[in-house]
């Protein structure tokens, strides 16, 4: 049980961060008609939709959004709690696309590695980039986000909790010490 809960991002700060991240994606992408966002279950999916909405508001272009479940692609299945896999929803070919994988928090990099393996089953994108709301460090794999909302150095025993309106009824990021 955590001794202390510290707010890292408020709802307003999350909104501003998503606007900044959307602008960075637009800047780096070039041809937005080739852009697709793929959220990693669970909170990467609503985050991808929020990001797509921001891009649409800024550029007046609809961005395709998919969702990927990495449960069966993980290399640490024996260490995580048993869970029922969510359904991957990528109703479009990824060949030649600019794919931005979206997740709420990056920690050791294992979820992203699994997502990279899963995504390539849906085509061969021209480029795959990674966007995270919070980067807490402690990587075990050479995986680094292209877009980061907030870098948050943490101790390994601490937890970062992301709450998003569509899933949790509120927007907030907390550090549990």
From Swiss-Prot:
InterPro entries registered for this protein in UniProt: PRibTrfase_dom, PRTase-like, PyrR, PyrR_bifunctional
Similarity remark: Belongs to the purine/pyrimidine phosphoribosyltransferase family. PyrR subfamily.
Disulfide-bonded cysteines: none
Signal peptide: none
Keywords attached to this entry: Glycosyltransferase, Transcription, Transcription regulation, Transferase
Cited function: Regulates the transcription of the pyrimidine nucleotide (pyr) operon in response to exogenous pyrimidines. Also displays a weak uracil phosphoribosyltransferase activity which is not physiologically significant.
GO molecular function, one term: uracil phosphoribosyltransferase activity
Extent of motif PRPP-binding: 99-111
Protein's organism: Gloeothece citriformis (strain PCC 7424) (Cyanothece sp. (strain PCC 7424))
EC numbers on record: 2.4.2.9
Gene that this polypeptide is encoded by: pyrR
The protein's name in its UniProt record: Bifunctional protein PyrR
Highest taxon above the source species: Bacteria
Reactions catalysed according to its record: UMP + diphosphate = 5-phospho-alpha-D-ribose 1-diphosphate + uracil
Entry-linked SUPFAM superfamilies: PRTase-like
UniProt-listed GO biological process terms: regulation of DNA-templated transcription
Enzyme class: transferase
Presence of keyword Thylakoid: no
């Amino acid at each position: 049980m955590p001794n202390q809960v510290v707010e890292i991002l408020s709802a307003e700060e999350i909104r501003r961060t998503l606007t900044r991240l959307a602008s960075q994606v637009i800047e780096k992408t070039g041809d937005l008609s080739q852009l697709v966002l793929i959220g990693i279950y669970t909170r990467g999916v609503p985050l991808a939709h929020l990001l797509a909405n921001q891009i649409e508001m800024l550029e007046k272009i609809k961005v395709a959004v998919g969702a990927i479940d990495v449960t069966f692609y993980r290399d640490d299945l024996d260490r995580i709690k048993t869970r029922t896999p969510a359904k991957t929803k990528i109703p479009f070919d990824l060949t030649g696309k600019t794919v931005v994988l979206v997740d709420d928090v990056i920690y050791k990099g294992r979820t992203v590695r699994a997502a990279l393996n899963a995504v390539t089953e849906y085509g061969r994108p021209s480029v795959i980039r990674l966007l995270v709301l919070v980067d807490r460090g402690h990587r075990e794999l050479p995986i680094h986000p292209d877009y980061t909302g907030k870098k948050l150095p943490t101790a390994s025993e601490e937890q970062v909790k992301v709450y998003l309106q569509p899933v949790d009824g509120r927007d907030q990021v907390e550090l549990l010490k």
